[in-house]
Amino acid sequence: MKLWGGRFKEEESKLMEDFNSSLSFDKKLYYEDIKGSIAHVKMLANQNIIKEEEKEKILLGLEEILKEIDEGILKIEGDYEDIHSFVEINLINKIGNVGKKLHTGRSRNDQVALDMKLYAKKSTEEVIECLKELMDSLIKVGNENNYIMPGYTHLQRAQVVTFRYHLLAYFEMFKRDEKRLENALEFLNESPLGSGALAGSTYNIDREYTAKLLGFRKPVDNFLDGVSDRDYIIELISKFSIIMMHLSRLSEELILWSSSEFRFIQIGDAYSTGSSIMPQKKNPDGAELIRGKIGRVYGDLISILTVMKSLPLAYNKDMQEDKEPFFDAKDTVISCLKVMEGIISTLKVNKENLMKSVKKGFLNATEAADYLVNKGMAFRDAHKVIGEVVIYCEDKNSAIEDLSLEELKQFSDLFCEDIYEFIDYKNSINKGIKKEMGYF
């Protein structure tokens, strides 16, 4: 049974049936579809478009279908065009011809737009919750490991930071991601139900009532816009892409830090794998997969942008292709956030190796230049002097703080005994605005 066909003389080909069907993926929307239908039926009865007893029969049937799907009794499968057809046809089979009144005053165009809005709202809230859990772990692990470590530019040791402060940089990125998603919820807060195919309905539909029942702030202002745009899907996948970019950057650093060349951290066994041939290997596959999966989400964004490009108003079948990219992007970002939270919460930090790396990198060179500036030298001159000191140290395989005062005075008479206190790593990180890094 199809929900259309009266004007056709010939049957749809099996090839076209299979090509046209979206049930294999839009079955994810069954909950939203049924909840939308429940609100629609209540509104129809309130507006005296259907009888009260008809409403009760339809509601009972819809609730039974939802329960049977949730319990695995009713499988979402078969030769149905989409999830809307599946629900409506099963409703008619369950309660009889009264089920045919479900679709009164409604099109699949506003129906699917509603389903996607509801699903997108729920998905956004799920991603926000995953972000919060990851941010909590970043703070907790950072506070537990507030050790001095090298900060990098160009992947070269640059200045001293702390492990905690480094993790907090990612906290700030994810905090902005959370804010972006919270802002996006505003655009998801308008209900398209009642827009019909594109031009509303001749029935006295109460769109405000259904919008309130379904948790929306208001109905959409324009019927055409309500059924024909998916900019909110594009926006969400764009925001998911930014989250994935941040996750990928963090993954790359965790991969580097866990390598034998760095040995700053050890990723837990629960988020690592081994080699089928090399017994000694412990591979950071969780982080590597997160880094790799960014391509999927970027691809999903390009896919939906391409689908919507140049589409005339209102609904076009092209828009059926909005679902798989969104479902994939949402599932991917959630799984990556959960795995990253697991990696962060179980990693071990090697305090000694962090400090060894600090001492090897002349990370107090800037502070040494600042010392000379405090003694009256112009910064550019101080920069040159300390550069020469670094060359001298490299030739001697020594650190700046290990040079004698006599050696330092070869470069400037401004050096005094207090240089050693000034360039001490633990002291310097608590000087000036650096105190904001919160080393304790």
From Swiss-Prot:
GO cellular component terms listed in the entry, alphabetical order: cytosol
Pathway annotation: Amino-acid biosynthesis; L-arginine biosynthesis; L-arginine from L-ornithine and carbamoyl phosphate: step 3/3
Catalysed reactions, as listed in the record: 2-(N(omega)-L-arginino)succinate = fumarate + L-arginine
EC annotation from Swiss-Prot or TrEMBL: 4.3.2.1
Domain of life of the native organism: Bacteria
InterPro entries in the record: Arg_succ_lyase_C, Argininosuccinate_lyase, Fumarase/histidase_N, Fumarate_lyase_CS, Fumarate_lyase_fam, Fumarate_lyase_N, L-Aspartase-like
GO molecular function ontology, one term from the record: argininosuccinate lyase activity
Major location (coarse): cytoplasm
Record keywords: Amino-acid biosynthesis, Arginine biosynthesis, Cytoplasm, Lyase
Signal peptide (UniProt feature, chain positions): none
Protein localization: Cytoplasm
GO biological process, one term: arginine biosynthetic process via ornithine
HAMAP family found in the cross-reference section: Arg_succ_lyase
Family: Belongs to the lyase 1 family. Argininosuccinate lyase subfamily.
Name the record gives this protein: Argininosuccinate lyase
Organism annotation: Clostridium botulinum (strain 657 / Type Ba4)
